[in-house]
């Protein structure tokens, strides 16, 4: 099993598959040894709560979610990552990888097919450029999420937490308050 917090191991696997980061996808991979376990804990991943992860990356967060015991359905749009994911997550039998864009997914169908009647949470490390669209997609889905746990850039967090009517408010400010 890969040590996701060892930069040299991560580099080696990326080099093995001749992977280059895509600026257009806003890719960055978590390697901090404390962030992913904490996110998995906060989102409530467990036998009683399944998780939909948006953006598998190389599987760092995915593996931490899976270690909590429940089913993880993870979606990745970058085809160049598929063989890497197959290798890095091969030891887990509670992960299903969907090769698709989360924004084009039928989340209700995925939940019915994969989680039956369990609670479902969302967990993701979101690129800046797609944070608001993804959050809006999740909020407007009509699904009763157990929770939505995301890592986002400070600028987006500031906009989400802004007081209505202030300079840095945006549609996401009001949407979070409405759906809250």
Spell out what each predicted region is.
Residues 1-180:
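Catalytic cores of RNA-modifying enzymes
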């Amino acid at each position: 099993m890969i040590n996701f917090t060892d930069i040299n191991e991560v580099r080696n696997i990326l080099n093995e598959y001749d992977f280059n980061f895509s600026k257009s996808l806003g890719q960055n991979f978590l390697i901090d040894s404390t962030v992913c376990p904490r996110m998995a804990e906060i989102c409530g991943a467990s036998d009683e709560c399944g998780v939909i992860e948006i953006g598998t990356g190389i599987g760092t967060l995915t593996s931490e979610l899976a270690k909590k015991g429940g089913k993880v359905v993870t979606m990745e749009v970058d085809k160049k990552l598929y063989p890497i994911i197959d290798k890095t997550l091969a030891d887990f039998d509670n992960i299903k990888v969907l090769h698709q864009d989360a924004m084009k997914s039928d989340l209700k169908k995925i939940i019915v097919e994969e989680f039956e009647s369990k609670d479902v949470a969302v967990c993701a490390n979101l690129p800046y450029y797609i944070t608001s669209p993804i959050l809006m997609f999740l909020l407007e889905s009509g699904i009763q999420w157990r929770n939505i746990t995301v890592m986002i850039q400070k600028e987006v967090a500031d906009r989400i937490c802004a007081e209505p009517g202030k300079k840095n408010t945006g549609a996401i400010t009001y949407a979070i308050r409405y759906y809250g």
